[in-house]
C-alpha cells in the first residue's frame, strides 16, 4: 500500500516548574486536527505606568510619540492575561487603572504572525496512553501481524513525554510498547489458521555507538551496521531472543532498560541519554490440516518487523548540562536529530539526490523504515509552555515535513528456507525422521539379537548332531573292525577244519582229538544238550563199530573214562562219585563246544563275498556319514562365521544406537523444552 507517514502531535500538561513560573500557553488546539500559535503576552514599560491614584488623561499625538520615545526597560515579569483575550487599549477612554500603550501594542500586533499546522491526529494534555495507542498504533500493530513492516516513533524535545508515551508508567497506564505486545499475543490467540514465531531485539544508540541492551558481554557493545542487498540495513551481532508470552517480553524489556543510559539534567531527573529501538520480528505460516501433502512446509512464510522507537530529546546545551558528560551526550543527541531532520526534509521534497543516511547511526538504522517497505507513524511530543515555544515550534515543523513522506508498504513473504519458522519446521521434520530411524534401528537391533539367540540355539543343536555323528562314526568303525576280525577268525577256522577232515590227524592236537568225538557222535546221538550222565556213560562204554573205524582218534580221556567206568561196575561209592563229577564237567565242555560249533557253522556259511559286500556297504555308509559330518562341519563353520559377522554388526549397531540414543536424548531434551514453552504459551493464551 502506498501511503504517507502518519503524524500525530501530543501535548503534555504543564509540569511543576512551569506552573510555579506561571508560564503561558502559546498553542491552541482547533478543529480538524489543527494547532495554532498564539501571540506572546504584552509587556508594559515601567516609565509609562503612572501612579494608580492619578487618572490618565487622553494623550495627543505628540504626547504619544514622547511616551513611545521614553521606553527603556520592559518589566521582568510580564502581565498575565487570558489566553484568548489579549489586552486592548482605548485612547478615547479616561480614568482607567490600566495604562494605555498604543505604541507597544501596535508594534507587537504588527510583528506577530500566527502559525497553523494540521496533522493526522492531535492529542491534548487530557488524553491518556490508551487513546493514543488506539488511534495511532493499533492499526500498525495489526498490519505487522499481517506481514507489513511497521515503525512507531516518538520524537520531541527533552522532557516532553516521549518515554512516557512509549513505555508508560506501570500497569495502570501502560505505553505503546506494552500495549502492542499485549495486542500481538491476543492476535495470535485469535488467529487459529496460522502459526507464529516471535523474536525480539533491543538496542540503543549512545554517543553514536550501537549497543545491545539484551547482551551483557563486551562484544555486545559498539556493534557494526551492515547492509544486505535483499533485507536491507541490519546490525551485525545483535541478539535476538525467541519469546513465548507477554511476561517473557516484558521481562526482557525490563532487563534492557536496566542497561540503558539515563541521566539527570536541569529539565528531567531521569532523562534518556540514548535512542532506543525495540524490534519484534514476526514470522507466520498457514497451518494446513494433517495429511495434506508435506504438512504445509511449502506454504509461504510471512516475515515482518515492528520497530518501536524512543528517541532522546533535543536540548539546549547552555541550559541542560550540569557536567561535561551531559554536554557531550547532548551534542551527540542533537547531531543525530539534526541528521534525522535533514533526511526527513529531503525525503519530503521528493529529492532524488543524495540523502545523508550514513551521517548518523540513527538514520542509518532507520533507513529501511523511512524510505522503504514500511508503514510509519510518528508521534511528536511538545509542551505548550511559553518557555519552550521555539523548541515546540521546531518539532511541529519537523512533523509537517515528515507528513509529506510517502512509503510503499507491501506484504513480505518468503518462499525458500531462509525463514526461521520454516527452518524450525524442517528441523522438526528431520528430527522426527531421525527418531523414526532410531526406532527402526532399535527394532532391527532387537531382531538381530533375537536372531543371534536363535543362531546360538541352532549352533548348539548342530554341535549335538556333530557329536552324535562322531559317536555313530566311531560305532561304525568299531563294527567294521569287529567284522574284519571275525572274517580273519572264520578263515583260520575253515583252514583248521579242512585239515581235520582230510584224515591226517595227529596225536599232537588236543583240540582235534576233542572235537572228533563230538562230530562223530553228533550224527547218532542228537543234540548234546539232551545228553544225561547215564547216556553219556553208555556212549563211552560202547565199542567202536565198523562205521566209525576211521575215527580211531578217540581221545585218551574217553578211553580212560571208559576203563574207569568199566571198572566201576563193581567198585565202591567213592569211585562212583568221582565218575559223576567227571561226567558233569564233560557235559559242560560239550555245551561250550556246541556253542563254538554253532559260531563256526555261521562263519562257515558266511562267505567272503557277502562279507566284502557288507563291508563295502558299511564303508559307503561311513563315507556318507563322513560327507554328512563334513557338511555339518562346513555348516557349523559358516554359522560360526555368520555369527561372528552378526556379533560385529551387533557391536556396530549397538555403538550407533548409543550415539543415536545420545542424540535422541539431546533432541528429546530440546523438544521437551520447546513443548514446555509451547504449553506455557497455550496456558497463557
UniProtKB/Swiss-Prot annotation:
CDD domains given in the database record: KISc_CENP_E
Kinesin motor domain span: 4-405
Highest taxon listed in the record's lineage: Eukaryota
Listed name of the protein: Kinesin-related protein 11
Position of the signal peptide: none
Stated family: Belongs to the TRAFAC class myosin-kinesin ATPase superfamily. Kinesin family.
Localization, UniProt: Cytoplasm, Cytoskeleton
